[in-house]
């Protein structure tokens, strides 16, 4: 089984500042997950460092999203949608193989 961990920063890629509240960003993330027909996810507020393509470094609020029981294609589509919804240069997608089940 694969576990997908997505990390999305909350600073706008153009202004390099957080333009929407963390709560509003979480609402947008939940909407993306709902439209992707994800049946469950764990969201955690974290802090992250990101170096933009122009070399600017930012320390930003981020959301870590842990997903099970979906396909890699679905995970990649979620990342693409989050890049648009949150106006990001990039979104992290980590894929881990593990043994997990709902009990």
Model-derived features: positions:
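Positively charged, small/polar-rich N-terminal and surface patches that mediate targeting and assembly
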Residues: 1-103
